[in-house]
Amino acid sequence: MLKSAIVSIVRASTRFAAFTVLIGVFLAVAAGFYTYQHFGINTDINHLISSDLDWRKRDIAFEKAFDQERLILAVVEAPTPEFANAAAAKLTAELSKNNINFDSVKRLGGGPFFDRSGLLFLPKDEVAKATGQFQQAVPLIEIMAGDPSIRGLTAALETGLVGLKRGELTLDATAKPFNTVAATVEDVLGKQQAFFSWRGLVNPEPLTDGDKRAFIEVKPILDFKALEPGKAATDAIRQAAVDLKIEQDFGARVRLTGPVPIANEEFATVKDGAVVNGIGTVVVVLLILWMALHSSKIIFAVAANLVIGLSITTAVGLMLVDSLNLLSIAFAVLFVGLGVDFGIQFSVRYRSERHKTGDLEKALVQAAEYSAVPLSLAAMSTTAGFLSFLPTSYKGISELGEIAGAGMAIAFFTSITVLPALLKLLNPAGEKEPLGYAFLAPVDHFLEKHRIAIIVGTIGVALAGLPLLYFMHFDFNPINLRSPKVESIATFLDLRKDPNTGANAVNVMAPNEQAAREIEAKLAKLPQVSRTISLDTFVPPDQPEKLKLIQAGAKVLEPALNPEQIDPPPSDQDNIASLKSSAEALRRAAGEATGPGADASRRLATALTKLAGADQAMREKAQDVFVRPLLLDFELLRNMLKAQPVTLDNLPADIVSSWKTKDGQIRVEVLPSGDPNDNDTLRKFAAAVLQAEPLATGGPVSILKSGDTIVASFIQAGLWALLSISILLWITLRRISDVALTLVPLLVAGAVTLEICVLIDLPLNFANIVALPLLLGVGVAFKIYYVTAWRSGRTNLLQSALTRAIFFSALTTATAFGSLWLSSHPGTASMGKLLALSLLTTLGAVLLFQPALMGKPRHIDESGDTDL
């Protein structure tokens, strides 16, 4: 019944060939127009998991409550903390004026509130120490505030040397500051880009990268009609940084990360090189088709059939899922790789029949008769393999399976309608030579003669490698699927190195402030937790004592910071004289002494002497290098001395909105201890937090849950694929033994594929795990072709035209998968790599293992025709 139906379809298609082709072209054009109107890609990796899962619902609720998805984090990095803060303040002010691209712009951990209240967040003893240092520095601050120039700086230096004479400090204690100043002067003299931080000078610990960063949180207005909805916003930020001369004035750079830039660059990474790879793939596929078919007319027919099918599949896919995702977009490559298989199988069968009969229409009908069962069974099995993803919670692959499954049905239908019609219209020349591979006769005989040894050896190798699967691991971190070369990911990876940035934070929602405090207290006791943060964190403890210390310091320091008058700017000659005077004072201080302090004094004296002997422009540059950050620090110091009590009631609204929802829920942020870049550390951290607070969400918790979901989906899809394909095979073949002959080589290929993955250190991940259930659908097609030929009594299968069709079909599929391997996107590339590997093992199983496993047919075809 199936055979007669397909033969009837082929007869009708060739009888009305022009009409059939016209309908196919019309549908392809209409589908292309629909695709043009509705094409879209959702690049958000979070949407690859079903939103119906409990943990995903919590993630989504949290993201909506705090608008986390629509976020750009601008990271301002400068050579000094002063310039990082100044550049961020300038950029924040500029972006706040833009109501076209941004809904809101705010500083994180900076701005007026933190400038004024910064001292309150220090421990009480550190506040006392800082205010004490302020009072000791009054004479120096008074000089520099009243004369912010080279003259004032050198005067402050000489005042400090007086303290050295009095024994208030040792010469060696000056080694660090003197060397730091000397190095900066040397950079100026060497015409290098020079920067100086007064904060770094007085800080006992070296400045970290985190000290020299400032953050701006931007909520952009997204254009969802564009393929990159946030591109206008990110472009506006970058242009603002250029217009403000952030790099020239502050030596700063602005990098963007967060969901919006990551999504933008994710799409850019996917399309990067896609055109070149696509063209290369087409060229190679055409070359393979030529080697398989040796006829430009047949190649044109197969290629045209493929284009028509792909156009229709794309439109149908968009109808099914609205927009493609980063995994489902691979359907096009899968369609080319697998859809062309049907075309090659039918065309090679047609060529074989044309060689025997010489009549075009008769050859097409006979090709349909011979191909009907294996081709339709292969199409159904491949479709079943793809559709096995539908019941899973891994939405990204579920949608890929849905589209690719529809694509296989479309490819099969066009291969028995449009392709025969095209061949009828094009009327390729007859075949003069048989299509089999007679040179493979020795291999056929070897497989037959050593059948038992090959079966035992192959299964033995597969079984011996099973212990390797213990070392197979799943890389559950989706960040590893993204290119570390793009700015947004490179920035995120840099931030992740700093445990204080919260890049690996987990969040817990508390119903109220008291519950938040209880959750904080419980989680803070976990060894896997380094610290917790909530709204209460922004209300410093011990404020009365700290405010008294600050007020006492302000009484002494404010007059020095705000002199009644500022000295007129010095002349260049004044600066030269002051430099020489300070150099001489440094040499006197060093005297004949040895040690780091004396060496540093002489080094600084030499640098100041050289600066005095340089041109005026060099001295003006040096003055700018030291004075600009000094004035910024003085302004910050003035603000810090104005600290006022901080309560939950007077916290800035932008801080409150980041930690408290409108209905009163409080966010508790939990940061991990240990190496934040270690997957095992993050897994233990997430597990510990979940055990204490099962409703925790975000960060490593979401990553851990995603990994569990995907592994479960893979197992579920694999079982569904195996079950559905087995049922299809049994319905068609009606023999359990024949079903086993089809599936055993497939399972062996699957086991060997995983074993090789361990040996070449190719872990499974969110993207490439798709290859394994697909292996069932793809690989079973080749097995079906051999089993159906074997059941019909054919022998010497390697010498047949069937092997030619399978070999070149596999080559085209490998080429399509190889194009994925060459992708700039790490996730897509890993998927292509594993697909290509699985195809290689599958081809080896079908060409070498399966003939030995099948042995001689039950009923041998005595015709002796190997050109099948």
From Swiss-Prot:
Disulfide bonds: none annotated. Residues 299-425 form the SSD domain. The keyword Transmembrane helix applies. One of its GO terms (biological process) is lipid transport. It comes from the Bacteria. Its main location: membrane. It is found in: Cell inner membrane. Disruption phenotype: Deletion mutant no longer contains any hopanoids in the outer membrane, and contains elevated concentrations of hopanoids in the cytoplasmic and inner cytoplasmic membrane fractions. Total hopanoid abundance is unchanged. Deletion mutant grows like the wild-type strain and forms single cells when grown at 30 degrees Celsius, but grows slower and shows a filamentation phenotype at 38 degrees Celsius, suggesting that cell division is affected. InterPro entries: Hopanoid_biosynth_HpnN, MMPL_dom, Mycobact_MmpL, SSD. The keyword Glycosyltransferase does not apply. It holds the Pfam family MMPL. PROSITE patterns: SSD. Gene3D superfamilies: Multidrug efflux transporter AcrB transmembrane domain. It is a multi-pass membrane protein. One of its GO terms (cellular component) is cell outer membrane. Keywords: Cell inner membrane, Cell membrane, Lipid transport, Membrane, Transmembrane, Transmembrane helix, Transport. The chain crosses the membrane at residues 16-36, 273-293, 298-318, 326-346, 370-390, 403-423, 452-472, 710-730, 740-760, 762-782, 805-825, 834-854. PANTHER family: MEMBRANE PROTEIN MJ1562-RELATED, MEMBRANE PROTEIN YDFJ. Essential for hopanoid transport from the cytoplasmic to the outer membrane. Required for the C(35) hopanoid, bacteriohopanetetrol, to remain localized to the mother cell type. Belongs to the resistance-nodulation-cell division (RND) (TC 2.A.6) family. MmpL subfamily. This is Hopanoid transporter HpnN. The lineage of its organism: Bacteria, Pseudomonadati, Pseudomonadota, Alphaproteobacteria, Hyphomicrobiales. The gene is hpnN.
